[in-house]
Amino acid sequence: MCAGRCDRLIEFENVSFSYTGQEHGGLHDINLKISDGECVLFCGRSGCGKTTITRLVNGLIPQFYQGELHGRVLVDGQEISNIPMYQIAAKVGSVFQNPRTQFFNVDTDSEIAFGIENEARPPQELIERVEQTADDLRIQKLRNRNIFELSGGEKQKIAFASVYAMNPQIYLLDEPSSNLDMTSIQELREHLRLIKKQGKTVLIAEHRLYYLMELADRIVYLEKGEIKGIYTPEEFRHLSEQERERMGLRAVDLRAVFPPKPHSIAPIPVLELRNVTLRYKKRTILHDIGLSAGKGEVIGVVGHNGAGKTTFSRALCGLHKDCEGQFLWEGKPMEHKARLKRSYMVMQDVNYELFADSVEAECSFGIRNPDQTLANATLEELGLAPYRERHPNTLSGGQKQRVAVAVSMICGKDLLVFDEPTSGLDFDSMTQVAGLIRRLSN
């Protein structure tokens, strides 16, 4: 690798790539140069090739993901396919869309130290670097925690910390805000500001755009594997709302987003919670809560990462048993088995609930007498029809999310619970999911 700073740190020269056995998700004739210290945001609809860009830079293509690659990807003037993986890992740090896939340890401190440890650093340096990382990123409260007991947002923070501890020159972030609450997104923005101030090169594949407008030097818009536009933040802000929606992109200014006026709901409650207390490993998560919900009502449950939203959702569906109080449906008590039969939950990490070998089969998996007409219509409405023969594990994160939502629409349950249903979704998919939820409620 070249000594000192290279003006062009990353280069794509006529790059095309297609995954083995897949028609979608590849790239076509990509030409792009990224300078050292630059922050570049990649945006576009789910499956447009954002994640593929990051896999080409960190060497996972072609060393892990198989397919047909044409053109050259260079880092520091060297073709990435010729650089040993251990050298790439020392220079390029990756935070994946699903942080669970990059964890190697069961506790947070060991995970943060894992990359440095593999570089055979002295033990004292490991300790100092973990402490410095926790201080810089303000995650002291996450130290010495069991990773499996963290919320999705907390896992995302540890994944970023494990990369930060290695001090790479290049950061690759794939949907880094997908599991974060508003406060944590602001913290992420400050972390990105910090590494940019340190002169790091940052590539971000993201659907949430608003928090990056002051950080990105350039914004690259991808469509069906091709670069359709490269903008400065100022140029991007001046896109009309109609242009942005046509491109399938979320808002760049949250002040422009106003929720619709809620419909009046019949006051007769169908679901009731009375004096419910939830515990996890003898620790009280939520205490003495009550809830009354009418038929057709859509209720949003909000709170910070780790506040108990997922535990509450799991309790509603009968998946969390350590609870006290009453759960009633139409005035009749429901124990956890009854709640399991009446409800369906789309989890925050949908990889836990995709079992079939095709999208089409997933839509009838475990469902008695599935309505095939409804299944086909739902796949069409969520833009999944072209992928009906694809294995769910070959889809992008946003596409997997839509598959899980599609199953919830088809299963015929009375109570649907969605845990972060819009994480990883582009604008089109987000509005489609919102429309389906509203239609089901009606």
Show which residues each predicted segment covers.
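Conserved ABC ATPase "signature" region
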Residues: 124-142, 372-387
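Conserved ABC ATPase signature
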Residues: 146-150, 154, 391-395, 399
